[in-house]
Structures are given as C-alpha cells and as structure tokens.
C-alpha cells in the first residue's frame, strides 16, 4: 500500500480529536505540484542555473533560511519557494511538539494519580464493605490503566507516523525540485520533542508493569503488540476484530482507544517493512530500535551519507 493511502487510512481509524494534529500530508503533496519540475540535464523550467549545492549549509538552524523572504542568490529558481515550504514544515513541527508535550505531561499526571489510587486500595485492604466493592474499585483502576496505556501507544505511533510523513514529503520535494532539503531537515527533526520518545517509552513500560502485576490474566493491551504483528503479516486492512468479552470489559469509550491503538500499531508495522536497498534515512532504519532508545546524535544519519535509492523507503514496496 502506498504511503499516502496508508496515512489516510490511519487518520480515518484514529481518534477524531487527534486527526488535525497529524501532518497535513495531502495538502503538502498537492502544493508540490506547483513547483517547477527539475531536470538533471536542463535544470528547472526557464532556468539557466544548475547549482547542486544545498540551500541550508547550517543544519542546526533550518528556520533561519525560511525567513529571508526572497530568492537565494546563485540558487536554482525552483528553490525560490523553498522558504515558504520550510515555513510550512516548521509550523507542522510546532504543532507536533505542542500536542506531544501536552499529552506526555498529561500522562505523567494521570499515571501518578493511578499509582496513588492503587496504594490507597492496598492501604484499605480489609476495610471494604464487601468483596464486590473491592472488585469494582480494582476494575475501575484496571480500566483507567488500559485507557492510558492505549493513549500512550497511540502517541508513540503519532510520533513515528508524522516522522515517516515528513521523510516522505521531503523526498518528494528533493525529487521534484532537485534540492537537498531532506537530509538537513531530517537531522533537525531527530532532535524535536515529538521524536524524543524515551520518557514516553518508560511511562508505557511502567504502565504495563502495573497491568501485568495487578491483572496478569487479563492484560489485553499489553499483548496487543503480538496480535498486531500477526495481522501485519496478512494483507487485510480492515479494523481489528475485538472480542465481545473485551468490548464489555473496556466500555465503548475505551474500546475506541483500544481499536485506534491496534490500527496505529498495524500501520507502523506496515511502514517498518525494510526496503531492499539500505538507506540510513529510511523509516525502518531510524525506528528499528525505537522500543529500546531514541535516535540520538550518535546514531543519527551522518551528513556525509547520500540517498542514491529511488526506491520508496517509507512504506511497503510493491
């Protein structure tokens, strides 16, 4: 499945209130159609310039080049529009970061409150009026743990999918204009808050540990990753089937989160399929160890690496 279709399918299956927080991939793709097409032999239409130098030599300050407001001297005319294109991408980064940081802070607070509730239940041991009262309190905690775990996994996949979309649209930009924007902008993205998922990963594992400790026989969400792996090996792209038992246990609101989580994880599995040609900027290369560590300056792509592959590297090949 092509990336655009995969991305659109995920947006349709995710939580409605999250949809406008994702990359505006389709509008950006349409915008590129207005850019002059670059020919390796003749350069862009009506151009006498054939300079192959990147516009941004300083990869640590991409936004500065977007603020000069005009044509960069000695650079291909197709790059007149690069400043406006980068401004749009920077606005998208700001949107990702704001949403991600707000959600992460919310998770920290909610998980701490749940841990305090668990401690309160332990302290009240033997003080409940009935066994049913104890069971009801524990089920409420369990439901809230399942809910927050699902939202955390959704946020991790939010990070991955938006990164994949940025890499894809930057590749299209470079191919269309003959520019060299993809590498410096991608290196900038690697250090953005929305792509720094180590703290979130720790929260996910802490939540899973509580689920497995308190409810070892009923940790549906903890086991969802293996279930999604099985789904991703097939070519079915319908919504995952949810058992009647799971539905009645989670409730309608939590079930929506659960289903969206499975859909997001299935989309990521599809995007992580390795391409036949190694590319240090490919989605699968950068995210293959996401569960263990975030990409850092030490293991990020070296600026000397070049992308010679014409094969799509942000999605499954066909």
UniProtKB/Swiss-Prot annotation:
Q: Which GO terms describe its biological process?
A: cellular response to phosphate starvation; phosphate ion homeostasis
From the UniProt entry, list the residue stretches annotated as the region Disordered: 226-247, 284-318
SPX domain sequence ranges:
1-187
Concerning InterPro entries, the annotation shows: SPX_dom, SPX_prot
Tell me the domain of life.
Answer: Eukaryota
**Which Pfam families did the record assign?**
SPX (PF03105)
Q: Where is the composition biased (Low complexity)?
A: 226-237
PANTHER family documented for this protein? SPX DOMAIN-CONTAINING PROTEIN 3 (PTHR45978), SPX DOMAIN-CONTAINING PROTEIN 4 (PTHR45978:SF7)
Query: What protein name applies here?
Result: SPX domain-containing protein 4
Which species? Arabidopsis thaliana (Mouse-ear cress)
